[in-house]
Amino acid sequence: MAGAPLIRLEDICKTFHNGDLAVEVLHGITLDIRAGEFVAIMGASGSGKSTLMNILGCLDTPTGGRYLLDGEDVSTLNADELATLRRRTFGFVFQSYNLIPTSTAQENVEVPAIYAGTPAAERRKRAAALLNALKLGDRLDHRPSQLSGGQQQRISIARALMNGGRIILADEPTGALDSQSGEDVMELLRSMHQQGHTVIVITHAREVAERADRLIEIRDGQILSDTTKRDIHTPEATLQPHEEIAGNGAHIADISEAVKMALHALRANIFRTVLTLLGIIIGVSSVVTMLAIGTGAQNTILDRINAMGTDLILVRPAMAGFRGSGSIATLVPQDADAILELPNVKSAVPEVTGTVTLRRGNVDYQSQANGTVPAFSSEIVESRQRQLHHPERYRYLRPCGWLGTTVVKTLFPDGGNPVGDYILIQKIPFQIIGTLEPKGAGFGGSDQDDVVVVPLSTGNLRLFGQKYVRSITVQVKDSSLIDTTQNQIQSLLDQRHKKRDTMITNMSSVREDAAAMGKTMTVFLGSVAAISLLVGGIGVMNIMLVSVTERTREIGVRMATGARRRDILLQFIIEALSVSAIGGAIGVILGLGAAALASWAGLSVGYSFGPVLLAFACAFATGLIFGFLPARKASRLLPAVALSSE
């Protein structure tokens, strides 16, 4: 027979290692097979025939010798080049069928074409045509578990033909079939040979081997005999390697098909997928909720500081090494008058505060009394009743005052108008001349409405018996010069008191400190919530490792039909990313819902796109990071080893 052989094996050896033990399975196999031959390789169990088949089909590599396929030295090819060679040249028919259990008959047949980059419509049409030709047209949507052994083997044959199957390698194709089904399979193989396929059957049964034109018998890893049983009829036109699409379209198809296969695999074990999703959902929803609550708390604090005014400077008595600022008696109302003379000062309000006992009728109530001057009520605190609001009432120790809404509700539970009425403050009758606008909770959670405001002189002498003040609140004209004004106030008071006995802060710096503290708290809350996301990521990795272990044979089938390492890597990474993306999306929705529920319950919540995007991105990154190791493990499997797994 003229021409170079399609397959040439030269002194092929194969050794397996088990620890320090080396076992040589093939011993110097030399063999030629020409295109279009129908060859049977026969041997008993342990003879090395399956190992030889794995080497012939590029599922495994020899330890020594040369393997030339169509004149190309296969030993020089890397894993992905071998995958391409398998995809373009070989079709495999296995004894155990090796169909993907979660896929339909048509989807199983399409697998080789997926990795060849064949467009979806074209491969569906070809798969249906092959199954129709094998009398399985009414079983396209059936899964392997719904089919008989003979039907499954015919699906395996259709899959072998999907990319052309220039060389058909059939490993014990009738071993798991009844006699009639086995006869049908052998007739199909004979028909494929007559159509130009090179058919190599691996078998232990002589009656099967006798159906081939050439019988090669192997024993103990060596060729025992090579017999041509009849005149070899080589078809006039043998098949050529399968052509594939290339370029960007192929890469896009790779990703698209990987996404479809990933979602298909996730649906196949929905309960486990849901359990895996829960970890990501809980993690993402926790991050979104905690960041929303943390941002809301930060915004609340800043809003309250802004409500107090960022143009304010607070002067308090303080001295290094001296405890109890309220006991320092050097800050006096005259200091406020001096501060008012500074160029950028709009107002300077001295204030004295203390706890007092209020009484009306038989109701006693403890509240906070603030003694201040007219600027306090006219510039900082809004009053509902101004008809009695005259500066003269701040002088001459007049016993009058304004009540906060909390005090009004406590002392006047009937809802009557308190203006003009009298109450006792520290057993001294005071006339109520106004009420204060509600302020709500203050910085630190204090009730700003639990207060009674009285003239400064009245508070100092009648209520607290002192001449000094507790603080001076300064309002500036230009907030951009607040730091300069603060320094001027400090210098003025140091000069007046002959020593440094005051502490001065401005609300702008307080706001900055509060903002920094709020960010720290938000980060802390987010970090605590992120721990649950990390746990969810570990769950993804565990499930993916289990999935790789369970689907090892499926991985082998995909590799045998032409999947490259990157195809397997991409599929399992996308499975992990799909879990994380779906869980992340659900987690974001639930997190926003939980934040809305918290807002409805009265908590301050801050919504922004950033934390939501961050949580989703973290979930996506979690899937990528924790899915990579299982995916890499899957892609590193040897096809022959994966196919032999249980």
Swiss-Prot record:
Residues binding ATP, per UniProt: G43, A44, S45, G46, S47, G48, K49, S50
Coiled-coil annotated spans: none
InterPro entries linked: AAA+_ATPase, ABC3_permease_C, ABC_transporter-like_ATP-bd, ABC_transporter-like_CS, MacB-like_ATP-bd, MacB_PCD, Macrolide_Exporter_MacB, P-loop_NTPase
Alphabetic keyword roster: Antibiotic resistance, ATP-binding, Cell inner membrane, Cell membrane, Membrane, Nucleotide-binding, Translocase, Transmembrane, Transmembrane helix, Transport
Alphabetized GO MF terms: ATP binding; ATP hydrolysis activity; transmembrane transporter activity
Entry membrane topology: Multi-pass membrane protein
TM region positions: 274-294, 528-548, 572-592, 609-629
CDD domains according to UniProt: ABC_MJ0796_LolCDE_FtsE
This enzyme's EC code(s): 7.6.2.-
Subcellular location per the Swiss-Prot or TrEMBL entry: Cell inner membrane
Domain ABC transporter: residue ranges: 7-245
Oligomer status and interactors: Homodimer.
Function statement: Non-canonical ABC transporter that contains transmembrane domains (TMD), which form a pore in the inner membrane, and an ATP-binding domain (NBD), which is responsible for energy generation. Confers resistance against macrolides.
Protein name, UniProt field: Macrolide export ATP-binding/permease protein MacB
Protein encoded by which gene: macB
